[in-house]
């Protein structure tokens, strides 16, 4: 377990604060039961827990976070509207398995972009990804190409999409860290967060149906309609996924007080209960354990004080002063173990030049400070 923190703060006459890392020995490892897992503090991007986060794995329907992101970005650009009517085509429905997640949309049926997004994000309907992808890019293949392009733009190093849905296919994979990068971008969209937090949603009759559709969330952390016993206070979405190849997957976030955590759990198992009465879906239980571990063990702590004198730097070419006092431009916090003594942190100052040249104004950058703990930086 490692904690990484980039504090992008310019200091008054000095300093950009660098990486803060706490070694694994600082806290007891929660030993998450999954192929890969990641826990990140949302505001700072601090990695609180990581397990195999760069491994290339099947990710099932967590793929749909990217599919939805592209649609919301298209809406922002004015290329689509939430109230826009879209008609399902035969090509969009072709090749989807009958036993996959579906909203039972048929060829020629018309729904709005908003309704299709709810189908995608609440019940994980596969056909909606193809329908919206075809609408946006002209073909499903073109939409998949755009998914891969966007992944690269977001900095994903271990991701390749072969379809819009997450159905098992050669060349379709991602990693826990890459899914976090995609999710971090998606949650910037308010409507995305509204949809992934929706417990149930009703779609009125369409041109092809006489009855309304009632959608119930697949996410047992926020809804017990499908699975009972997993509700987590403060949980906010985000996306479930499950295939034989991927196992049980879940990307989620949770809020407690002023803190928000984002978790990714991939390749968890479905374990039979000891009494044989059913199964435990460990993507939910392990995510809940991750959240509890993060909230219980970490809190923001101040690592730099804007009023603190860091050091004095010699000044050349000045008749008025021989040194200049170096202070942080602003205070800086980092997400740290609650029981960590901040005085144990090590600060290393690296000056751009050993001597500052006049004239010097308040707020000028003179170098960099790295805050570290133990033997890691």
Task: Give names to the regions the model predicted.
Residues 156-160, 168-173, 177-377:
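Domain-terminus/edge residues, biased toward the C-terminal soluble/receptor-binding domains
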Residues 16-17, 76, 290, 298:
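Hydrophobic alpha-helical membrane context
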Residues 1-2, 61, 283:
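Short alpha-helical segments used as structural interaction elements across diverse proteins
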